[in-house]
Amino acid sequence: ASFAEAPPGDKDVGGKIFKTKCAZCHTVZLGAGHKQGPNLNGLFGRQSGTTAGYSYSAANKNKAVLWABBTLYDYLLNPKKYIPGTKMVFPGLKKPQDRADLIAYLKHATA
């Protein structure tokens, strides 16, 4: 199912998902720096593999996806299927509600 068919996201629930599943490798605050994964500030509208100061896989750079609600929704289902060769080891979020909640949080936290 596509993002257009996704349930409404809850940013507060999404924040909890971020803390438990994403924060080990990612930061969202402006200038927070990179961890194992890149800082996600300014994520929406940015092309994959272009965050300054982070060493991306060739796969991530070459995919050249523009991050938006719909592309993140598909990516977060199964990152390694969406971008074969990505360094991201996270297996994905299978539940549409979890992905919608996380995206709602990211839209708020990375703006």
UniProtKB/Swiss-Prot annotation:
Matching Pfam families: Cytochrom_C (PF00034)
Subcellular location: Mitochondrion intermembrane space
Single annotated GO MF: metal ion binding
A GO cellular-component term linked to this record: mitochondrial intermembrane space
Residues bearing PTM N-acetylalanine: A1
Superkingdom, natural source: Eukaryota
Presence of keyword Iron: yes
SUPFAM superfamilies: Cytochrome c
Processing and modification events after translation: Binds 1 heme c group covalently per subunit.
This protein's UniProt keywords: Acetylation, Electron transport, Heme, Iron, Metal-binding, Methylation, Mitochondrion, Respiratory chain, Transport
UniProt similarity note: Belongs to the cytochrome c family.
Function description: Electron carrier protein. The oxidized form of the cytochrome c heme group can accept an electron from the heme group of the cytochrome c1 subunit of cytochrome reductase. Cytochrome c then transfers this electron to the cytochrome oxidase complex, the final protein carrier in the mitochondrial electron-transport chain.
PANTHER family, per database record: CYTOCHROME C
Protein name: Cytochrome c
Lineage of origin: Eukaryota, Viridiplantae, Streptophyta, Embryophyta, Tracheophyta
